[in-house]
Amino acid sequence: MLSHSHPCCQTASVSRPPRLSFKITAMLSESKQRNPRILCLHGFRTSGLILRSLITSKWPDTVLRNLDLDFLDGPFPATGKSDIERFYDPPYYEWYQASKGFREYRNFEECLDYVEDYMIKHGPFDGLLGFSQGAFLSAALPRMQEQGKALTKVPKVKFLVLISGGKIPGLRFGQPKAAVGAFSSPVRCPSLHFIGERDFLKTEGEVLVESFVEPVVIRHTSGHTIPKLETEAEETVLSFFQRIRKMLSDEASSVRSLM
């Protein structure tokens, strides 16, 4: 199932109005293992609808039919020019803002509250998928949740899909106070990483991989984008999600055995 939800709010505050959703229902496989529910966080000054368009146009049905994807818009309208204006119409959104040198952050805590509120109302979600700014945010959340700094009212984030991401703080970036300690030790959360050979965040992506225990990495020849899945990459993605589906199935069986 694919869905897209957007806010209607001002930069100064985060409001939570009714959402408009677009949904496509996917069938469960014969194994009866349920599809992982994934909250998808788009890149800087883009939108959930744009990320949805990119993924559905570049990833094959063999992958998409086994996933339940929900594409959320960031809480804040874009505060400047978007790099994708030539290709996609507005509106565009941001998850949070930073100073020119990425040394000071604004609205990061408000962003955390906004994401958690959506997860409460529309979850539960099993994992997160993030691209660019959405990947920076997603990568930090499992440890922040573990430390009680974010997502304290929703179930544990069980896995991550990180495309063109990096660490908060990164090699060239400052650090929001709430994210202190997000990578103080290896992150024990199953993770799938996409790193582009021509991506300006390639180095940040490589450093991010080192912060996770047993990460799965797909390297591609493209730049800062959602890559098409060639045969080998498709097999890697399918294998990763089959492992996730089994993990979710085993957890459900364990819960039922205790009832």
Placement of each model-derived feature along the sequence:
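Short beta-strand/loop motif that positions the catalytic acidic residue
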Residues: 186-187, 192-195
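Gly/Ala-rich beta-loop-alpha elbow adjacent to hydrolase catalytic centers
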Residues: 129-138
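N-terminal chloroplast transit peptides
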Residues: 1-18
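Acidic catalytic loop of the alpha/beta-hydrolase fold
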Residues: 168-170, 195-203, 224-225
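Catalytic active-site module of serine/aspartate enzymes centered on a nucleophile-bearing elbow/loop
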Residues: 230-259
